[in-house]
Curated annotation (Swiss-Prot):
It comes from Corynebacterium efficiens (strain DSM 44549 / YS-314 / AJ 12310 / JCM 11189 / NBRC 100395). This is Deoxyguanosinetriphosphate triphosphohydrolase-like protein. It comes from the Bacteria. InterPro entries: dGTPase, dGTPase-like, dNTPase_2, HD/PDEase_dom, HD_domain, PHydrolase_assoc_dom. Gene3D superfamilies: Hypothetical protein af1432. Residues 1-23 are annotated as: Disordered. It holds the Pfam family HD_assoc. Belongs to the dGTPase family. Type 2 subfamily. Keywords: Hydrolase. CDD domains: HDc. One of its GO terms (molecular function) is dGTPase activity. GO terms for biological process: dGTP catabolic process.
Length: 426
């Protein structure tokens, strides 16, 4: 396994030893990274993902996939891939658990709406919110002067969870569309990235990122097939496939021909052909599960082999700060094609845009409701931060933090309250 250092295990705030052990208790022999994983697993922020949208809403269907179930799948894939690469399995799993922890209600649609209302305080980005939750907002470790350090994870754990290790504003003033830290959290990111010589994410973070793509494409396609929104026979319909590839290239970038090539290699797999005949029978459910299992193994196994081969050839040093995940072109094409299937068939649903409009309206209403009623409208923890804020931007950030933390059920209850008040006021 990669030799992690004392610096990797450092925490932002030094913690006192536990003082409530019973007499003659065994010493806690867990590693620092095992403790980190436990902190994330027991966090309220992770549990709230159970009521946040993945591709469809958490209340759609009998066996819905939510941000939480998706995160558990990403964590399992990342642990296996990380172990195969010689990375700490606890860190790899933790990265998967954390990867969506900063996402607000309604997924990417909610993220866009919050970015609009947060314009006065520098915008909103789910990945930057993840760092903020882990190091500030999740109540676990508070210093004597009342400063919150969030879960107070180790440096390596925070780095593993950081997909975009740069702030919104680059040193040259360039504004980044995707980023892993708000400008006001730059000092925390600087501490996390100590020892890195470039902007490349840690190898654990790269592993988490591709595990996310695998889970998103394979498992969400499975959901779509069961729900009747996706028919794998499109892989054999070259006319519809060409149209789908064009849409996928526009949505996710790349060449449509690459997606068509991805479909061609998928058609050659017997498990894909068997799953294409899904009819909700017992045998077809088993065939579908066989396909998801084999595809995950296909992409994880090929990536481990390609990455290890490149390292043996001496193309780079191998480890947390010195590694490049190598994804084989065939795997990349297939994953992007499946991701296109997972997303675009939902996006083409006639009710999708109307549903998104309603979601955005709720976020706008709740933001106005909380802002106008603050600090009394805020939860006690956020109320304290609101009162401590130095300016309007800081106070707006606190309101955005609270909305981002909400489950969809709670946001909808508040939106109804906000509608009632605005109706009463005329």
């Amino acid at each position: 396994m990669y030799p992690y250092s004392e610096s990797d295990a450092q925490r932002l705030h030094q913690e006192a030893p536990k003082a409530s052990q019973l007499a003659h208790s065994e010493v806690d022999l867990r590693s620092d990274f095992s403790r980190d994983r436990a902190r994330v697993l027991h966090s309220a922020a992770l549990r709230r993902l159970a009521d946040k949208t993945q591709v469809v809403g958490p209340r759609d269907g009998d066996t819905p996939r939510t941000r939480l179930t998706h995160s558990l799948e990403v964590a399992q894939i990342a642990r296996g891939m990380g172990s195969g690469l010689g990375l700490d399995p606890e860190l790899s799993e933790l990265a998967g658990l954390c990867h969506d922890i900063g996402h607000p209600p309604y997924g990417h649609n909610g993220e866009k709406a919050l970015n609009e209302v947060a314009a006065a305080c520098g915008g909103f980005e789910g990945n930057a919110q993840t760092l903020r939750i882990l190091t500030r907002l999740e109540p676990k470790v508070v210093s004597a002067d009342g400063t919150s350090f969030g879960l107070n994870l180790t440096r390596a754990a925070l780095d593993a969870a950081c997909k975009y290790p740069w702030t919104k504003t680059s040193p040259d003033g360039t504004i980044n569309r995707k980023y892993g830290a708000y400008d006001e959290d730059a000092h925390i990111l600087e501490w996390v990235r100590r020892g890195h010589t470039d902007l490349r994410p840690s190898l654990e973070a790269q592993t988490m990122d591709f595990s996310d793509d695998i889970a998103y494409s394979v498992h969400d396609v499975e959901d779509g097939i069961v729900a009747g929104r996706i028919d794998l026979k499109v892989l054999w319909d070259l006319v519809e496939l060409a149209a789908l590839a064009q849409k996928g290239a526009r949505a996710f970038g790349g060449d449509p021909e690459e997606l068509i090539e991805g479909a061609a290699t998928l058609r050659e797999l017997p498990v894909v052909a068997a799953a294409a005949d899904f009819d909700a029978s017992l045998s077809s459910y088993a065939a579908l599960k066989a396909m998801t299992s084999e595809l995950v193994g296909r992409y994880v196994g090929s990536t481990i082999a390609a990455t290890r081969a490149a390292a043996r050839l001496g193309e780079y040093e191998f480890g947390r700060m010195h590694g490049e995940l190598v994804i084989r072109p065939e795997a990349d094409r297939e994953v992007r094609l499946l991701k296109t299937l997972a997303v675009l068939y939902v996006m083409d649903d006639p009710g999708h845009l109307a549903r998104q409009d309603r979601q955005r309206d709720r976020i706008f209403r709740v933001f106005d409701y909380l802002t106008l009623g603050a600090p009394g409208s805020l939860d006690p923890m956020y109320r304290q931060w609101f009162l401590e804020a130095d300016d309007d931007a800081g106070r707006a950030r606190v309101v955005v933090d609270q909305i981002a933390s909400m489950t969809e059920s709670r946001l909808e209850r508040l939106a109804r309250n906000a509608s009632g008040i605005s109706g009463f006021l005329g």
